[in-house]
Each structure stands twice: as C-alpha cells, then as structure tokens.
UniProtKB/Swiss-Prot annotation:
InterPro entries: MGF_505. Plays a role in virus cell tropism, and may be required for efficient virus replication in macrophages. It comes from African swine fever virus (strain Badajoz 1971 Vero-adapted) (Ba71V). Induction: Expressed in the early phase of the viral replicative cycle. This is Protein MGF 505-5R. The lineage of its organism: Viruses, Varidnaviria, Bamfordvirae, Nucleocytoviricota, Pokkesviricetes. It comes from the Viruses.
Amino acid sequence: MFSLQEICRKNIYFLPDWLSEHVIQRLGLYWEKHGSLQRIGDDYVLIQQDLIIPINEALRMAGEEGNDEVVQLLLLWEGNIHYAIIGALESDHYSLIRKLYDQIEDCHDILPLIQDPKIFEKCHELDKFCNILCLVLHAVKNDMLCILQEYKMHLSGEDIQVVFETACRSQKNDIVSWMGQNIAIYNSGVIFDIAFDKMNVSLLSIGYTLLFNHHINNTNENINSLLTQHLEWAAGMGLLHFMLETLKYGGDVTIIVLSEAVKYDHRKILDYFLRRKNLYQEDLEELLLLAIRADCSKKTLNLLLSYLNYSINNIRKKILQCVKEYETTVIIKILWKRKINLIEPILADFIGYHSYTYMVDFMREFSIHPEKMIKMAARESREDLIIKFSKKVCKEPKDRLHYLKSLVYTMRHKEGKQLLIYTIHNLYKACHLESKEMFNLARFYARHNAVIQFKSICHDLSKLNINIKNLLLECLGIAIKKNYFQLIKTIETDMRYE
C-alpha cells in the first residue's frame, strides 16, 4: 500500500510540538520504548525531540530489537538495509533476517560493516552456497584473524596458499606475518612477487623476516640469487627504498643491477649508488652506452658523463654507433655543449638515410650551416637534399644556380662535386639564362672538367645560332692548362663544325 500516509512518513522533516503521542503513533512515527521519530536531513534521526543519532545506527538498533515497523520506516528514509540485518543477527531475529535478506543480493556486501567475528560468521552463513574457504577469504580481507585461526585446520594446502596470497594482495600485514609463522605455506615466495606488484615495502620486509627468521628451506645460493633478483627488480622499477630494505639482508648492487636502473632511466637510484661505489672506468662507460641506447634523459646522461669526467675517448666509436643505430642525438648535444664535437662523424650517416625534415631539425639544433649540409648531401649522393637545402638558401632558380656553383669550388670530394655539377645542369635546364650567363656556365664546366655538361650547353648555344668559336678557344686553353684530355678532344671536335 502506497498511501498518503506513506508519502507523509517518507517526506516529513518536522513534527509540530502540539502533536500528541497518540497521533504520532497513528502516523507510524513512534518507536516503542524510545519515543517519537523525526527525520533530520538525509542521514540522521531525532528520537523523542532529544537524541540525534545516525540513521544507520538507528536501523541497527531497530534490527537488534526485531522491530520490523521501525526498520521499514527507517528504510523508507533511505537507511542502509545492511545495518538492519546486522542488528537482527546480533539478537537472532531470524524471521526479520529472512524478510530483509530476501531484499539484498549478496551477504558478502554486508561483511565489511561488521566488527564482531561471531556476527561475521552468522552473516556469512546466510549464503547457503558458500564454504569455509569463502568465509576465511572474506575474514582475511576484513582483518578477522581469529576466524582464520579457528578454521585453519579445515583448509587444504591449496586453500592455505590461496588464503596467503589473498592476505598478501589485501596487504593485511598482521595476517601475513601470523600465517608465515604458524602455517606451512607451499609457495611462500609469492609474498615477494606481490610486494613488488603492490609496491609495498612493508610486505617485502615481512617476507625477508619470514625467510631469514623462520627457517624456510632455501640454500644460501638460492637466497643470494633471490636478493640479487630483487635488487634488479627494484632498480628497474625505481624503488630505491626496496633496494635499501633488500640490502639489509644481503646482496650487492652490481653493474647488472645498475644497468636495470639505467634502462628505465631511474637517475635517483644511479646517483645514490654511484656516490657510494667506486666503479671501474669500463663499467661507467658501459652504463653510458646503455643509457644512450635506452634514450635516457639529459640529466641521466650528464650524471654518467660527470663520473667519467666527460672523457669519452675510449668509447667514441661506440657512442657514434649507438647514435646511428638508435637515432638519438641527446648525447651529441650534451657533448657539443662541452666542446666535444661528434657532429661531423655522425652527420654523414644521418644525412645518408634521414628525411629532409629530420635533417632541418638536426641542422637547427646544432647550428649547422646549410653549405655543410649540401656538401654532405652531395658526398652521400642525396640530390633530393641538395635541391631542398639550396631552395631554403635561395628561392630564385638563378640565385640557386650561382650559389651551387660557389660550393663546387670548395668541394673536394670527387663524386660529390660531380653530383653538384649534375644538379646545377638540371637547374640550368629548368630556368632561362641569357647568352652571357650561358657562356659563364660553359667556362665553369670547362674549369671543372664537366665534359657532358659542357658539350650539352655548347649544343644549346649552337641551337640559338650563337657563335661560340671564341668560347671554345678560351675553354680549350683551360683544358690544355689543366690536362683535361677528354675535354680537349671534345672541344677540338666541336671546333671542326664552327
């Protein structure tokens, strides 16, 4: 029945003083032996205009008394039904318990609210499909050690293992300690795995206490191996406090352990132990190379370099190999600021296979002049980069042509010079030059023994009906002076037709 009275009971927050006790009882707002009930906000009730208590505490009291009418009123006021069940369990009001329990889905939701172990067990028994293991697991999760102590003999070895792991994962340290000291556990080492997983150093400490003080069967070799493994894990996870806790029981921070800290860029761990250990130069160098491969931060690289006094002569080639293989330039920049230049050796490798966009960023980062980039691109047969970098310097084709010509004069690499001349000639083909400019370009080709390009431009001049006899004579003189025999032969052949 959802009557007007029910609506009033649910929403009334104020009882006038002049209402008699009889009227209050008829409204259903009276609690026998306690007095009138009045809702205060959403979470409290006022009893007999005098005592204010939380609505859930009132529900527990009503459940304990078995007062179904008051329970229903308080539930109407949005109290938590779990507290009514707890109260009913305290006084064994099973008719009320059954009525209320039918309205909830799972007794396990109530367990965290219970402090009394006996009530805890009673509540768990409401679910007829649960077993002792289920009870103990929930007891562990809710710090009910006494229940575990009572039922430990009813658990199999496999059950004990499950309970122990649950205690570890729930980080119930007192229960973990008690189990380790009083119950035979098949795989007690799981405590360490969970300690690292939960990053709980207290659990790690308990594990070591159990390992060393309660005679777990491990040989010294196994223990040493275990401690080393834990140091490596902690270093890789950046857990310095785990490392310090482990070192209380043995182990050593070796180069392998520090390598884990380097791999995951845990500079604070490195700093702590490098200050306290005198590592060999070779070990520091290996750590630095590993840091480069792992793309560690500038701070980590600087830290390792500082312990090497920025001396990299022994590993110069290895650094360059790492930079090339892992495409990282952080170390190059750090050393460059310390006046140690590794840009020249790496530039050729980078320009050989990186994109223009990447190389532009590289050029800006290290303040490299475009002229150097173009010459290196020529050495590495990257005509695409020659074109793009020259466009960056000179937007106009004619200006670009003159700029590239100027680079040829200072280019020593033979194949690189030939590629520059080839690029210049392609640029010439794409832009319109005056005859005077074409004559200058022909002389340029002659000076640099560019036979094919010289022959091509002379052919273009002839097609324009321009007399090139004097040009050929001038260029012949250049060729004879420089002993360019093939060019001499080409010019002499052309002169027969002029």
